[in-house]
C-alpha cells in the first residue's frame, strides 16, 4: 500500500512483497503511475481496495473502508505516550509482513489489536482523526489535480522541444540523458520549491496528454520508433528516501549543447535496443566522445552517486554491508593521460565491461559470477598495464598520484564526496567530512558509468 498519493490509495494494497530475497525469478512490476492506469487494471494485477467502492451512504462507506477500520482500531487501542514499544510491535525492515483485506480485518483486529494506523506511532490528534474520517465518509473525493505553474510552462515547452529535436546526434544525446535522469525529480529554475517533474518516454508528442511507455528498464525498447521524451508533473508527496533533485535551467541546456551537440563528431546510426547493446553503455553510446560523457557525470557526481544510494537497489543490510560506515569519494581527472579517458581503450575493453543485466532477471549466481569475474580480472589487468605503459613512469605515478585526481576544475563541489552508512540506509554529502576514513574510492569514467548501469539503470 502506497500512501504518498491519492492514486496509491485508489490502487489499494497487494499481498505480494516487492522485496523478497528468496525469490529466484522476476515478477511483473507494479509501479504506481506506470504499469497500470485504472482501478480495474490494478484489480486485475491482484490489488485489493482499501477505500469503499460500492457504498451508498456515509455509514456504508466507512464500514467498507479498510483504511477507516485501521484508523479506528488505533483509536480503540491507543498507544502509550511514554515508554518503549512492546516486543509485538516490530519495526525492523525484515519484519514479518501482514497485509489484511476488508474481509479478513476482524481476524486481524483480534490477533493484532495494537496494530492500528499509524503503526508504531502515537495516535493522531482528534482534529487529524476527525478530518480523515469525514473525508472517508464522503467517499474520499478526488483532490484537485496539480498543474504546471506559470513559471514552468514556457520552460516545459522549450525543454521538450530540445529533447525531441530530430537530428541523430540529438536523438542519441536525449537517449543518454534519459537513461541517466529517469529517476530524477526535475526542478525548473524559478518554479515553486516543491514542484517536480520526471523525464519519461511517451507515445504522445508534446502538447498532448502524456502516455508513458512502461518498460522494466530505461534502456528497454520503447516498442516503436515513434516516441517522445516528455516532462511529467510528479503528483505524489515527496519522501526523503527517493528524492533526488536535478535542476533544469538555461545554463543547463547550454551545458548540454556544449558537451553533446557542439563537439565535432558524427552519429551515423542510432544504437540498437537489443539487450546486448543497450545494457552496455560503452557500446550503445560509443559515438559520443568519452570526455562529454564523463564531464556530464562529473558535473553532478553527487546526484549520480545518490542514484544508487537512494534508488530501489539500496535497501537493507545486505545492500549496505558492502560499504564502510563512512568513506570519501574522489574522481579521476577527465584530462589525465589514462586509458579510461580514451575511446580506443574503451572500445577495446567494451566486451569486458558488459553488465549482468544482459542476462535478464532470473538468478543464476554461479554461472554469472564466474563469467563476470573473468571479464573483470581481464579488464583490471589490462587497465593496470596500460597505466604503467603510459607516458609517465611508475615512480611518478605513485609519487605524484594526486595530479590524476579531479579538482572540480577549481569550482565544482562534486569533486569530493562523503558517504555515510546508517545501518540499513545511506546518504551522500559534498566535501570531505570528518577525520581520515579507513578507506576511500577513486572512481574513473568506466567505473562511474558501470555503477550507474549496474545499480540504477539495470
Where on the chain are the PLM-derived regions?
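Aromatic- and Gly/Pro-enriched helix-to-coil junctions and flexible linker segments
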Residues: 1-458
Amino acid at each position: 500500500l502506497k500512501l504518498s498519493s491519492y492514486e496509491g490509495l485508489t490502487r489499494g494494497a497487494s499481498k505480494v512483497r516487492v522485496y523478497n530475497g528468496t525469490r529466484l525469478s522476476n515478477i511483473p512490476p507494479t509501479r504506481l503511475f506506470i504499469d497500470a492506469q485504472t482501478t480495474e487494471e490494478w484489480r486485475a494485477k491482484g490489488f485489493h481496495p482499501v477505500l469503499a467502492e460500492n457504498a451508498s451512504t456515509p455509514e456504508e462507506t466507512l464500514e467498507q473502508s479498510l483504511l477507516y477500520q485501521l484508523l479506528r482500531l488505533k483509536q480503540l487501542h491507543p498507544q502509550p505516550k511514554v515508554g518503549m514499544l512492546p516486543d509485538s510491535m516490530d519495526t525492523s525492515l525484515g519484519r514479518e509482513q501482514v497485509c489484511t483485506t476488508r474481509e479478513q480485518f476482524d481476524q486481524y483486529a483480534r490477533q493484532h489489536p495494537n496494530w492500528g494506523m499509524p503503526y508504531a506511532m502515537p495516535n493522531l490528534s482528534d482534529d487529524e482523526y476527525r478530518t480523515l474520517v469525514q473525508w472517508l465518509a464522503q467517499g474520499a473525493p478526488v483532490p484537485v489535480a496539480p498543474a504546471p505553474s506559470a513559471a514552468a510552462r514556457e520552460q516545459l515547452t522549450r525543454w521538450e522541444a530540445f529533447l525531441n529535436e530530430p537530428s541523430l546526434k540529438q536523438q542519441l544525446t536525449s537517449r543518454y540523458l534519459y537513461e541517466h535522469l529517469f529517476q530524477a525529480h526535475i526542478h525548473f529554475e524559478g518554479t515553486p520549491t516543491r514542484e517536480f517533474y520526471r523525464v519519461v518516454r511517451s507515445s504522445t508528442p508534446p502538447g498532448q496528454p502524456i502516455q508513458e511507455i512502461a518498460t522494466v528498464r530505461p534502456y528497454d525498447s520503447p516498442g516503436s520508433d515513434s516516441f517522445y521524451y516528455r516532462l511529467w508533473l510528479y503528483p505524489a508527496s515527496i519522501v526523503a528516501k527517493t528524492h533526488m533533485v536535478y535542476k533544469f535551467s538555461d545554463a543547463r541546456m547550454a551545458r548540454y549543447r556544449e558537451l553533446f551537440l557542439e563537439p565535432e563528431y558524427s552519429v551515423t546510426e542510432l544504437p540498437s535496443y537489443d539487450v546486448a547493446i543497450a545494457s552496455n553503455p560503452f557500446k550503445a553510446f560509443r559515438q559520443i566522445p568519452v570526455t562529454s560523457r564523463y564531464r556530464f557525470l562529473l558535473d553532478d557526481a553527487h546526484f549520480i552517486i545518490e542514484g544508487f544510494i537512494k534508488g530501489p537497489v539500496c535497501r537493507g543490510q545486505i545492500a549496505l554491508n558492502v560499504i564502510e560506515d563512512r568513506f570519501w569519494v574522489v574522481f579521476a581527472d577527465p584530462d589525465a593521460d589514462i586509458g579510461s579517458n580514451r575511446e580506443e581503450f574503451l572500445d577495446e575493453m567494451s566486451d569486458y565491461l558488459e553488465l549482468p543485466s544482459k542476462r535478464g532477471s532470473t538468478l543464476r549466481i554461479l554461472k554469472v559470477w564466474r563469467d563476470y569475474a573473468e571479464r573483470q580480472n581481464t579488464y583490471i589487468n589490462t587497465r593496470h598495464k596500460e597505466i604503467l605503459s603510459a607516458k609517465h613512469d611508475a615512480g611518478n605515478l605513485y609519487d605524484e598520484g594526486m595530479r590524476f585526481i579531479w579538482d572540480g576544475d577549481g569550482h565544482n563541489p562534486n569533486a569530493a564526496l562523503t558517504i555515510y552508512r546508517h545501518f540499513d540506509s545511506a546518504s551522500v554529502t559534498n566535501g570531505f567530512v570528518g577525520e581520515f576514513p579507513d578507506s576511500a574510492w577513486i572512481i574513473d569514467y568506466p567505473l562511474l558509468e558501470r555503477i550507474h548501469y549496474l545499480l540504477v539503470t539495470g
